Amino acid sequence: MQVLVASRNKKKLAELQRVLAAANVEGIELLSLADVPEYPETPETGATFEANARIKALDGVRNAGLPTVADDSGLAVDALNGMPGVLSARWCGAHGEDAENNRLLLAQLSDVPDDRRGARFVSSCVLAVPAEIADAADLEPEVAVTGEWEGRILRAEQGTNGFGYDPLFEPAEAPGQSSAELTPERKDELSHRGKALQQLVPALRVLAQSAQ
């Protein structure tokens, strides 16, 4: 069963592959947006992570005709009243500029003491399935899940793994380390996206079994 991951980020594709392998789910071939004919993507105008993930997942079903997993993730900082939130990827105004986003966040928190630098990563994932495939598998056409990862914002970047705000995020479970210093397997276990993807495993297992 081919399943589209609505992203061109190879690390996100690899993350879901590791989650499926750890759960012994076989029979799923993951494709990225680079593997299917290009299609016009609907702007992510949702006010929540789940709304944006749903937009991307339904785009995949409508244009590629495949079951599609999409996520929208971001950072919620207590001292910034939950921002950057859904604006995380374009916090500095340019989508995908990780270094600029990180510099801006550090500047905004420069006067915030360590005990008030609490933050969490949030990931909402949506699995959308074409109606005929959902009916055959006795599966809901949409499955939405959310994972959160608590921690705090460091005062300087640490580590070279991961992407986005990972070098600035100190997980509650790993004091003194950033999430960019964790192994991929440890990050899958702890992270917001890993937690969300693990909740999708039962539905993906049903899809795989329905194709056998």
From Swiss-Prot:
Function: Pyrophosphatase that catalyzes the hydrolysis of nucleoside triphosphates to their monophosphate derivatives, with a high preference for the non-canonical purine nucleotides XTP (xanthosine triphosphate), dITP (deoxyinosine triphosphate) and ITP. Seems to function as a house-cleaning enzyme that removes non-canonical purine nucleotides from the nucleotide pool, thus preventing their incorporation into DNA/RNA and avoiding chromosomal lesions.
Positions bound to substrate: S7, R8, N9, K10, K11, K12, S73, F163, G164, Y165, D166, K187, H192, R193
Cofactor note: Binds 1 Mg(2+) ion per subunit.
Any GO MF annotation of the entry: ITP diphosphatase activity
GO cellular component entries: cytosol
Official protein name in the record: dITP/XTP pyrophosphatase
Compositional bias segments (type: Basic and acidic residues): 183-192
Matches recorded under SUPFAM superfamilies: ITPase-like
Entry's EC annotation: 3.6.1.66
Residues annotated to bind Mg(2+): D72
Subunit and partners: Homodimer.
Region feature Disordered, mapped onto this chain: 164-194
Catalytic center residues: D72
Superkingdom of origin: Bacteria
Keyword Metal-binding included in the entry's annotation: yes
Keywords, sorted A to Z: Hydrolase, Magnesium, Metal-binding, Nucleotide metabolism, Nucleotide-binding
Cofactors: Mg(2+)
PANTHER family membership: INOSINE TRIPHOSPHATE PYROPHOSPHATASE, INOSINE TRIPHOSPHATE PYROPHOSPHATASE/HAM1 PROTEIN
CDD domains listed in its UniProt record: HAM1
